[in-house]
Amino acid sequence: MVTYSYDHIHIRSREPMETARYFNNMFGAKILESVQTDGQSRVDIDINGLIVFLAQADTTTPDGPVDPYVGLDHFGLRVDNLDTAAADLKSKGAEFSVEPKDLRPGLRIAFVRAPGDVRIELLERSG
């Protein structure tokens, strides 16, 4: 049987370093600069083991689709206390597209909109 495990998320950005700084400021991501196999520079970030590659988008690259759409919708970050996390992120200027709310018993969620319209779900799971 083949075993699969998480490796990375790859995001194209008009401003990779600006996007990396956003993730550093909001989520404490470590910023790592690297070079892709094609020789292009890339900014990688590490959010507590969640690796995200931020590659420079060409000026001709179209913006992403309007929500909702088929394909990758968002990625989620688990937090111990959603209200505390939301207050912390708001104090740093984060834009919430969905304010903290109860989704079902044992699950509270919120959504943050990062640069490039990347959607990040915050999840507080209990029980």
Locations of regions flagged by a protein language model:
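N-terminal beta-strand motif that seeds the catalytic metal site of vicinal oxygen chelate
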Residues: 1-20, 72-77, 123-127
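Vicinal oxygen chelate
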Residues: 1-2, 44, 86-127
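Exposed loop/turn and edge beta-strand positions of beta-sandwich/beta-sheet ligand-binding modules
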Residues: 5, 39-41, 71, 106
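Conserved active-site alpha-helix within GNAT-family acetyltransferase domains
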Residues: 17-26, 110
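Conserved acetyl-CoA-binding loop of GNAT-fold acetyltransferases
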Residues: 25-32, 93-95
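Conserved short beta-strand elements that form part of the metal-binding/catalytic scaffold
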Residues: 30-66, 119-125
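Mid-chain, well-packed structural core segment of small domains
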Residues: 68, 74-89
